[in-house]
């Protein structure tokens, strides 16, 4: 007769010690409940092993995704859960194609340009969040982050070395180019990033200006080769229409009512 009582403490302690030694965190956490269930329901040993290994695999996958989300440094936590496809000027078939992430796997770039408030940053971040959920590594910057990176490594000329871990990402997002004046350091940082990522890592940028107008933001000697590399393998999407944020504000959707 199979006993349904608790697993002997000595056995539990040994399993815990072995799991710690082998760094099987999720098996260690779930083995007490799994083993009790397996004993009560008379599982086949192979099924018990399968359930424990699946718990470890799923736990590690969750941990990896959370780590990638943290290192991506997304600014606002915007995902497709809050995305209103029907309010975007981007055609729905194009939105669906972008969400497939096949362009990331092909190391192609994405440029989303258009007026303020038309969903450029939201779309970029939602794509980045989706990429993380599907196992990709993502990094998020605004253009002044790149300027700060250049300045911090100028003295010892280690900017190329500093970019190496960034370039391990599957997708690099640079947000809001052209929203503010671009410093020479930021322009250099953007060029160095685009040049180093060329044909190896996907870069997505959002901008109030079409890249053909980047020479209004930075010296043409940097803008020209930067745009050449950025657009060579890029999908260019131009958003249109009035600001969605302003429309929500005018309709009273940007705040909770003070009185009900």
What name fits each language-model region?
Residues 16, 20-75:
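Interdomain "pre-motor" coupling segment immediately N-terminal to P-loop NTPase/helicase cores
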Residues 99-107:
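Phosphate-binding P-loop
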Residues 107-123:
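Walker A/P-loop nucleotide-binding motif
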């Amino acid at each position: 007769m199979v006993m349904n009582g608790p697993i002997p403490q000595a056995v539990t302690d040994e399993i815990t010690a072995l799991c710690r030694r082998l760094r099987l965190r999720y098996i260690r956490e779930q083995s007490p409940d799994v083993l009790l269930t397996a004993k009560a329901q008379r599982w086949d040993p192979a099924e018990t092993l399968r359930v424990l290994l699946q718990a470890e695999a799923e736990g590690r996958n969750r941990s990896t995704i959370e780590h990638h989300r943290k290192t991506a440094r997304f600014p606002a936590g915007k995902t497709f859960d809050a995305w209103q496809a029907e309010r975007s000027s981007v055609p729905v078939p194009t939105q669906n194609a972008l969400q497939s992430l096949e362009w990331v796997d092909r190391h192609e770039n994405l440029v989303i340009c258009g007026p303020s408030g038309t969903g450029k940053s939201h779309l970029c971040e939602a794509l980045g969040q989706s990429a993380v959920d599907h196992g990709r590594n993502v990094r998020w910057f605004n253009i002044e982050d790149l300027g700060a990176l250049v300045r911090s490594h100028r003295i010892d000329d280690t900017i190329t070395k500093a970019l190496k871990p960034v370039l391990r990402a599957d997708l690099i997002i640079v947000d809001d180019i052209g929203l503010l004046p671009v410093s020479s350091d930021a322009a250099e940082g953007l060029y160095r990033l685009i040049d180093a990522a060329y044909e190896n890592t996907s870069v997505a940028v959002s901008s109030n200006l079409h890249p053909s107008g980047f020479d209004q933001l930075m010296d043409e000697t940097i803008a020209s080769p930067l745009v050449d590399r950025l657009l060579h393998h890029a999908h260019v999407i131009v958003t249109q229409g009035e600001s969605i944020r302003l429309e929500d504000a005018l309709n009273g959707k940007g705040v909770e009512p003070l009185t009900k």
